[in-house]
Each structure stands twice: as structure tokens, then as C-alpha cells.
Amino acid sequence: MIVLQNKKISICREITVAPEIVWDILTDTLLWSSWGPSLVDVQCRDRYIRLGSKGRVKTLLSFWLPFDIIEFRQMDFWNWRVGALEATGHKIIHDTDNSCTLCFDMPWWAVFYLPVCWLALNRIDTLAMIQVHSH
């Protein structure tokens, strides 16, 4: 589902896994390059991000950009700045104890990034299913 609201575009996907598992994947910097198609490496002092976490990400084009977490609400939403730009927001909507809707939002002018976010949503769904079935 794609929604345009408040000058932001959101792309969402329902994931039939407990919201806590999805949140763990979203906030664990060791997993970011597993689901983020535009990232190949992450360096951050905090394994699990929080408000004010800082680090750097290596892009597919092999250059590093600094990042900082500029908004963080536990089990709800986080947003970051990459380089000089506010980047994607990451939101979890709790549907049931065993499912949630995960949304990425971005400024309207970043519409070209929707396919990257769609791929990330699919990868997170796969990672979440693997975690459920491995426990």
C-alpha cells in the first residue's frame, strides 16, 4: 500500500510476525545491510539504535555517509538523517500480537526510492519469518 499524506509518501506491508520481532530487526544495526538494499555496511557504537545514535553507512556505490537518529519512539517509529538529508522514517503499526504493518515514509520528492523501500519491506518480512521458525 502506498499513501501520500502531509508531504510524505509511505509504503507499507503487513507482516504476520509479532511486532517485537520486526522492531528488533529494524533497530539492530548488525541487520541493516541484510534488509536495506542501498546499504552494504554499517558502523555504529550502538548495536540497537536509540535517539541520538550516530554512525555511518556504506552505500552500494562504496562511499560512506554519516547518520544520526533524529526521532525515536520505542516499538513505534524512528527516523534518521543520512548525510545532510532527513531520510526514511520507519513505523510499526500493531495489528495483533502476531502481526503488524510496517511502513517506510519519505519526502514526496523521494518517490524514486519507493522500489528500494518495497524491497526492504520484503526482506524484513523474510528475516522475521526466519527468526520465528528458528526458535
Across the structure, where does each feature detected by a protein language model lie?
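Hydrophobic/aromatic beta-strand elements that line small-molecule binding cavities or substrate pockets
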Residues: 13, 65-71, 87-95
